[in-house]
Amino acid sequence: MSVIRTENLIYDFTVPDPEGEGEQKNRALYGLDLAVEPGEFIAILGRNGSGKSTLARHINALLTPTEGTVWIEGMDTSQEEKLWDIRTAAGMVFQNPDNQIVMTMVEEDVGFGPENIGVPAEDIWKRVTDALEKVGMTAYAKTAPHRLSGGQKQRVAIAGVLAMKPRCIVFDESTSMLDPRGREEVLSTVRELNRQEHITVLLITHHMEEAALADRLLVMDRGRLVMDGTPREIFTQREMLRQRGLSVPPVTALADALRDEGVPLAEGIFEEEELADALAAVCRKNGGRSR
């Protein structure tokens, strides 16, 4: 069974009419059909206004479809009686960790969610301990969140989601407010959760180098799913990406520029190590010369 499945997902929203005459209806999602399998690591790309965050909020049942259906582990998100089960199965980490942290001590914040759904006290603290260990924040259990760096706060937010024992986590631009070190801390945690804990990950991002870490990429444009494939398949379609207001990872752009200058490199390079190995091979072949 798919962890996430959408069928003809349509979402409309209303905004004030610019002429001041009531409201007008806009469409954010146009008939999305999507299936996400257990353990997948998917990155969702798209320019501002493409519908990425709107889709994310449907997965966590913060929004429900105008038309069509969203199922999370077989549960229809339009069924209010299933709301807490859905939000337990599919956790969400938002852009600003300060909006997700509600308590004055790290361990209390991580235990807040399980306490709210009635988890017994002895089980709560086991969940808190396990979650903090998984994100590398055990040493900060007694620390006030305001004393943490941005990356540390985001890892606490992730721990709070983990304490709910989700099978899937949606990261909605969760690194966009962080410095490079904080981004790397969070991304390292995300990779480990997917590889070691087999948690399904949906990473919404505008950083191409983050998207390259995923197993599968989805590209959205104007409320539609327009591309679906592996990073190698997607990042070799430079013109298609450009038309959607997107680029390739910096390392891919560098490899492409070198290829255009005559360096014999394969297409579809999107990892630094891969480029370094390819350049080393070229140098060995040419006796130390790059061409």
Question: Predicted segment positions?
Answer:
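Conserved ABC ATPase "signature" region
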Residues: 122-140
